[in-house]
Amino acid sequence: MGTGSPFADSRQGWNSRIALWCAVLLLAPLVLWLAARNGLAIPAQVPRDPNEGWNALHALRLMAGGPLYPPPPALMVNNYPPLSFYAVAAITRLTGDAIIAGRLLSFVSYLAGLGAVLALAARMGCGWPARLFAALFLAAVLLVASDYVAMDDPQLLGHALQLAGLLLLLRGRVIAAALTMVLGLYVKHNLIALPLAAGLWLLAQDRRAGLTFIAAMLASGLAGLALFRWQFGTSLLAQLATPRLSSLANMRAALGALAAWAALPLLLVTGLFRPVRTRFDNLVLLYLAAALALGLAFSAGDGVDANIFFDAAIALSLGLGLVVQRRGWAAPPPALALLLLFGLTVEDNAFAFGPSLAGQSARDIAFLRAHSGPAVCQQISLCLWAGATPAVDVFNIGEAYRTGARDPARLAKQIEAHRFAVLQLGSPDDLGPQVRAAIARAYRLDHADDNGLFWLPRNKG
């Protein structure tokens, strides 16, 4: 004889659905506001991140017929796969501005990725409330914990492609899924977690299909490497393996940033660990484990940003959808806690844009335009908008100097010879002590603001 009341069970289910819909309806305006904020900033000539100008410069070099992958003696480095540059170059022919083109592509990719999460959650059996909560969680994390939404960077394009590949895989289109996953890798090379997890999961589900999927990925990946060498005359793997310092301090900082938004969702997704798991539970847990392990490994490197844990955010969003669908959200507190988490960080997030920075950027662009010629720009976007010629990849060359892979004497001599009309750096130490000493001897600081430090040759007024 049962002891529970069907009316009590019905009431509990109804309360859970109300709690979930409240969470969705409260989270949606926050996401819409932040997404609109990022989208409206797309045309602004304000640097969002040093990556923007760097990506735009390579797209412009491609359009101009220059080398997309300069040989090692060059002071400009390209350590990204090629596909995103072709995409941005195509859009630049419409916009006239490569940075704006990259931002538009990023924003569209963001929306496409959210659409893919909705479709994947539906494929995994989630109803509309759970689907929406999963997508809104991911949307909020990307907006609050990073500055990548509508930023000229290929990360979100790569994720959108790989999520489309996962959707194809769940629909049984194994070879098309493998090809799409590899396309994502040729957009951004750090997107390893999802292909790895999908391959292992499919092997466990259907050995023949899993072997077909892995073989198709390997074959298309190797074909891409051969095509790259034929097109560019060099090895893509060698281009990607640029020297970079690593440290435990970098890893600790990345873990702290991850914990700020992921600790509570990770706790909630432990609901997928149960004696009897569905095949989708296993897929999401594999994906999450791979994303966290690879993200942690990559996070030790200099210059690694919040994007290294985007795969973890996607896996958590799908996991939350499954947990919410299964448990109906056991009580309102978890939903309200997530809302509080995002609400408290709205004013303390990675999006640095406002009237003050816009004014500074306009003045800095005018300053660079007034001193035409080759320039050293850490914020390459400022140089591009000013019509200046960026001559040095500050981050990658700086890392090469710090690791001993390159000798800074050549650049130090060029600086002492006043080869550059202007220098713009984030710090005097960006290019190491030898170059810093050369700057101190040959250049004077003109001004400093939120965009960095600006130097002119000492013999110029």
Where are these regions (language model features)?
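Hydrophobic/aromatic-rich transmembrane helices and adjacent perimembrane loops
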Residues: 193, 301-328
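Perimembrane helix-loop-helix junctions
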Residues: 15, 194-219, 241, 245-247, ...
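Specific aromatic-rich, kink-prone transmembrane helix
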Residues: 140-144, 157-176, 180-181, 315-319
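Transmembrane-helix signature of polytopic, membrane-embedded enzymes
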Residues: 117-143, 159-160, 174-176, 280-282, ...
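Transmembrane-helix motifs of polytopic, lipid-linked glycan transferases
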Residues: 25, 100, 104-125, 133
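Membrane-interface alpha helices of multi-pass inner-membrane proteins
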Residues: 162-164, 168, 174-189, 194-202, ...
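Extracytosolic helix-loop segments that constitute the early lumenal/periplasmic catalytic or substrate-binding loops
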Residues: 53-79, 83-86, 90, 169
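Extracytoplasmic
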Residues: 341-461
